[in-house]
Amino acid sequence: MMHSFKTRLAVGVLAASLALCAQAADVTGAGASFIYPVMSKWSADYNAATKKQVNYQSIGSGGGIAQIKAASVDFGSSDAPLKPEELAAAGLAQFPSVIGGVVPVVNVPGIAAGTLKLDGKTLGDIFLGKVSTWNDPAIAALNPGVKLPEGKITVVHRSDGSGTSFNFTNYLSKVNPDWKGKVGEGTAVQWPTGIGGKGNEGVAAYVKQIKGGIGYVELSYALQNKMAYTAMKNAAGKFVQPSDETFAAAANSADWGTAKDFYLVMTNAAGDNAWPITATNFILVQKKPKNPAGLKNTLEFFRWVYTKGDAQAKQLDYVPLPDTLVTQIEAYWAKNLPH
């Protein structure tokens, strides 16, 4: 009972703070830290072009879902798509905003970005605590000729409800049977080992601080923080580097036309050049909002994103949505939202 009260109190306090932000903004949003770098750039450029202000709070996908369900913001953002039945129950609509990638990041002396190779099974075993030193035979077998230290591995995971975690654990569940059986997938799971950081920002900070650390973040966080990310073996058996090109290769396998309410997860995608932990960010809005002007302004903002925001996304190593998908989104708006 006390835990439930504390949860309701925390949501209420956050809602109140977001409401204060709303008074000064034309559009308010909250959710995934995954897209915060590009959302910040979009918002600044949109303001410069239109004089309209978009206030986006990076609170994690779980927080974004809670806030849009509570109608505390004009839109929520999540890297974990909601299933059609959950959307219907909450009176929500959902559509994609941009595509990016989740990358393992490490702090291992002598290991530069892109030099360490991992596969899904070994990555899962590290996060299970089964592989606990950097010179473990499983890691050494994937990295012949690389001098690996004897040091202990410290796992860093998310402490908050996270779409980044959803895509990471969804991938591990597809490629590591032990992970699927013992942990599974979700925005929040019972982590077998490690320490928790809040947001992509928190995970990046901990990994940078902890010698021997490993975590997972969206690529732009790794690049901005000059962190060493790993290469990954994909579903085709090829080792690939994270980039907008390998994210786009994974996205090419997505069949959005058959995805009701755009419910689609593209981890472990086919293709020789596909990054295996590629993810989509989704925007959630109320179908019958208390503030119709907020929804109208939200759709105007994302219409601008789809037509004028590609360069900003590419600059930060995200992948803009293809024109065919944008056309589907506009048709979805016309069918499901007031206009």
Residue spans for each PLM region:
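Bacterial N-terminal signal peptides that target proteins for export
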Residues: 1-11
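Bacterial N-terminal signal peptides
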Residues: 10-19
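Flexible loop/hinge segments at secondary-structure junctions
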Residues: 24-339
